[in-house]
UniProtKB/Swiss-Prot annotation:
GO terms for cellular component: dendrite; dendrite membrane; membrane; neuronal cell body; plasma membrane. The lineage of its organism: Eukaryota, Metazoa, Ecdysozoa, Arthropoda, Hexapoda. It is a multi-pass membrane protein. One of its GO terms (biological process) is detection of chemical stimulus involved in sensory perception of smell. It is found in: Cell membrane. This is Odorant receptor 23a. Keywords: Cell membrane, Glycoprotein, Membrane, Olfaction, Receptor, Sensory transduction, Transducer, Transmembrane, Transmembrane helix. The keyword Nucleotide-binding does not apply. Interacts with Orco. Complexes exist early in the endomembrane system in olfactory sensory neurons (OSNs), coupling these complexes to the conserved ciliary trafficking pathway. The atypical heteromeric and topological design of the odorant receptors appears to be an insect-specific solution for odor recognition, making the OR/Orco complex an attractive target for the development of highly selective insect repellents to disrupt olfactory-mediated host-seeking behaviors of insect disease vectors. Odor-evoked OR currents are independent of known G-protein-coupled second messenger pathways. Odorant receptor which mediates acceptance or avoidance behavior, depending on its substrates. The odorant receptor repertoire encodes a large collection of odor stimuli that vary widely in identity, intensity, and duration. May form a complex with Orco to form odorant-sensing units, providing sensitive and prolonged odorant signaling and calcium permeability. Belongs to the insect chemoreceptor superfamily. Heteromeric odorant receptor channel (TC 1.A.69) family. Or2a subfamily.
Length: 379
């Protein structure tokens, strides 16, 4: 099955549509000689031009803004390439989620599943609103400037200030890059926390199924079959977690490496250089976007770890005492397997955990003081 045919995954429909528009789905299926490749070249062509213009401006605000945009654009390019290489695994993600959803039964499980779906929709809308606000504040207000200006401080091989045709060409070039990079950034940054929250809730649903075994009017054989089905659900849940790790691990490593630098640059400019109200609003919104990039990811990564830890105790919440010897044998196997700690690592190195989020802010403070000392603003 082609990835472009799997958009019926309701939980990630918006993210997959964003990847489809940006050409990621075509590239992941091997269609390199297509419009998608040309679009990606056009979208990321500003990256070396931004790199060429770093610290080439007289205004320190533009210099630091250019540095932040360059770091962000480079990280977006790296994350985009990593996702393209792994996006075909979304087909298996769809299958595993469908398998687990089909096991939802009973009023308590149905209510929890319904709440999970509603929360996923709210999270997705929050990301959409955040990135839409960042785009509007970043890409639109240049029209209110008294002089000709561009949304991004960037090096161009031609003089766009003295030619209206060159200016319009540079403006369209930058706006296209802004639109598609923010769209790619939205998909890449919103998918990991959404899927981690979904895994955490699927684990909680499995806990409910296991803990309810033996308290109804079913026979011993039926209770044993329910436990065997829960073991199959456990296998599917572990597989879903493994596939998710392979999808988000390295892109999140890039994000953790970049987040501290961007926070430091944003706060540095906001505290020492920004004077106008608009600039303050822009950098505050940019800081909000950076926070939304990472905090939900670390929070739901912590939730996943805690949910899998609770799975071990759910085994003994069932009415196992009155069950058959065969049931208790299966129960012991299930209990032993749940002892394995499920640790999410970005790049197989950094935990996707709230402690890492705190460490990112500590790293941002260190980089902030380094920048302040460099410019003689630390005292």
């Amino acid at each position: 099955m082609k990835l472009s045919e799997t958009l019926k995954i309701d939980y990630f429909r918006v993210q997959l549509n964003a990847w489809r528009i940006c050409g990621a789905l075509d590239l992941s299926e091997g269609r390199y000689w297509s419009w998608s490749m040309l679009l990606c070249i056009l979208v990321y062509l500003p990256t070396p031009m931004l790199l060429r213009g770093v610290y080439s401006f007289e205004d320190p605000v533009e210099n630091n803004f250019s540095l932040s945009l360059t770091v962000t654009s480079l990280s977006n390019l790296m994350k985009f390439c990593m996702y393209v290489a792994q996006l075909t695994k979304m087909v298996e993600v769809q299958s595993l989620i469908g398998q687990l959803d089909a096991r939802v039964s009973g009023e308590s499980q149905s209510e929890r599943h319904r709440n999970m779906t509603e929360h996923l929709l709210r999270m997705s809308k929050l990301f959409q609103i955040t990135y839409a606000v960042v785009f509007i504040i970043a890409a639109v207000p240049f029209v209110f400037e008294t002089e000709l200006s561009l949304p991004m401080p960037m090096w161009f091989p031609f003089d766009w200030k003295n030619s209206m045709v060159a200016y319009i060409g540079a403006l369209v070039f930058q706006e296209i890059g802004y639109v598609f990079q923010i769209m790619q950034c939205f998909a890449a940054d919103s998918f990991p926390p959404l899927v981690l929250y979904l895994i955490s809730e699927q684990c909680q649903l499995l806990i409910l199924r296991i803990s309810e075994i033996g308290y109804g009017y079913k026979t011993l054989e039926e209770n044993e079959q329910d436990l065997v089905n829960c073991i199959r659900d456990q296998n599917a849940l572990y597989r879903l977690l493994d596939v998710t790790k392979s999808l988000v691990s390295y892109p999140m490593m890039v994000q953790f490496m970049v987040i501290g630098i961007n926070i430091a640059i944003t706060l540095f400019v906001l505290i020492f250089y920004v004077e106008t109200l608009y600039d303050r609003i822009y950098y505050l919104c940019f800081l909000l976007g950076i926070t939304v990039q990472t905090y939900p990811l670390c929070y739901y990564g912590t939730m996943v770890q805690e949910s899998f830890a609770e799975l071990h105790y759910a085994v003994f919440c069932s009415n196992w005492v009155d069950q058959s010897a065969s049931y208790r044998g299966h129960m012991l196997i299930l209990a032993e397997r749940t002892k394995r700690m499920q640790l999410l690592l970005a790049g197989n190195l950094v935990p996707i955990h709230l402690s890492t989020y705190v460490a990112c802010w500590k790293g941002a403070y260190s980089f902030f003081t380094l920048m302040a000392d460099r410019d003689g603003l630390g005292s």
